[in-house]
């Protein structure tokens, strides 16, 4: 297996940098994320730093592990270790005769892409903040008011999780959320039938549901709550689009329970092929530390609506 380190390099406005493979390399003319092979005795992060300096002339300052995926090409099996790069010194330029292009990850206009990069672009369409409804505490009217403000401030991914609502009330509430968040992704917690009825974008499975499933539910986006490596492995084996792991820190909703902490979170998600959100006791300003420990982003309950 060939080990490769690749960088998802983000501009300040959220665009990503892609490079076009030059003549003389396998797959000439295909677009890819910058990076290259990991040499013997080299860590994936050190390999990426070296490759980015040699390939596009930048020295990363902010670089964090993200996801790892294995891809089978006709000529080789490749393990791609992806890192998020959000700060660097230097100006990116093609030092190996390759063309470079900044692209909106939600609307990539260059083609063709290396086949291994298609699922990576899909994962990049998941926003960094996953907001979980809290109408049981706020009340429906206030929750919708706060949701409207959050959507205006950039929230793009909402999970409807209201265990105390009866089915009819939950359906009415979910339809209001769908109408309010027309430009956001909306997932329903646990209730697959309701999610299909209201044409939600996704389903969020409980860990118990996850462990009893043998086939991924048919939704655009399918995620699950996980608490350990065994449950995360199950989410991966079903081909889920993302997972939410916690609780990372102590939280009022689980009094007396210690959080798993960032080191254990990081060790559990290391090398995972799907994006993982961190959950539990977090605030909006914890996004950076979460991503430093390998999280795709953060899932917020109370803090999402402040």
Language model feature labels by segment:
Residues 171-190, 207-210, 215-228, 257-283:
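Alpha-helix-loop-beta-strand connector modules within alpha/beta enzyme cores
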Residues 131, 158, 195, 235, ...:
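Conserved, mostly hydrophobic/aromatic
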Residues 82-86, 92-125:
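NUDIX/MutT-family hydrolases
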Residues 11, 69-91:
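Active-site-adjacent beta-strand/loop module that shapes the phosphate/pyrophosphate-binding cleft
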Residues 206-215, 244-256, 281-306:
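Glycine-rich phosphate-binding active-site loops on the catalytic face of alpha/beta enzymes
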Residues 1-16, 68:
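Conserved N-terminal beta-strand and adjoining loop/helix that marks the start
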Residues 127-142, 221-226:
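Active-site mouth loops of central-metabolism enzymes
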Residues 15-55, 66-67, 185:
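Conserved Nudix-box catalytic region and its N-terminal flanking loop in Nudix hydrolases
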């Amino acid at each position: 297996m060939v080990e490769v380190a690749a960088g998802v390099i983000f501009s300040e406005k959220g665009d990503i940098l892609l490079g076009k493979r030059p003549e003389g390399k396998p797959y000439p003319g295909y677009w890819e994320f910058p990076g290259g092979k990991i040499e013997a005795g080299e860590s994936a992060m050190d390999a990426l730093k070296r490759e980015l300096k040699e390939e596009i002339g930048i020295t990363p300052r902010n670089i964090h592990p993200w996801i790892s995926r294995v891809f089978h090409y006709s000529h080789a099996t490749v393990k791609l270790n992806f890192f998020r790069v959000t700060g660097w010194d230097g100006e990116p330029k093609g030092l190996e005769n390759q063309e470079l292009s900044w692209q909106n990850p939600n609307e990539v206009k260059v083609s063709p892409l290396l086949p291994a990069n298609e699922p990576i672009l899909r994962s990049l369409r998941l926003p960094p903040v996953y907001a979980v409804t809290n109408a049981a505490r706020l009340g429906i009217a206030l929750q919708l008011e706060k949701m409207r403000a959050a959507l205006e401030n950039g929230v793009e991914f909402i999970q409807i999780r209201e265990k105390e609502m009866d089915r009819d009330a939950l359906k009415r509430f979910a339809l209001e959320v769908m109408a309010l968040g027309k430009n956001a992704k909306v997932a329903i917690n646990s209730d697959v039938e309701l999610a299909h009825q209201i044409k939600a974008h996704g389903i969020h499975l409980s860990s118990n549901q996850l462990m009893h499933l043998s086939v991924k539910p048919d939704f655009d986006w399918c995620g699950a709550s996980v608490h350990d490596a065994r449950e995360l492995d199950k989410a991966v084996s079903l081909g889920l689009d993302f997972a939410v792991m916690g609780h990372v820190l102590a939280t009022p909703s689980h009094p007396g329970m210690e959080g798993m902490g960032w080191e254990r979170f990081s060790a559990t998600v290391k090398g995972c092929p799907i994006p993982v959100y961190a959950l539990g006791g977090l605030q909006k300003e914890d996004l950076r530390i979460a991503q430093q420990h390998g999280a795709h982003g953060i899932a917020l309950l109370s803090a999402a609506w402040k």
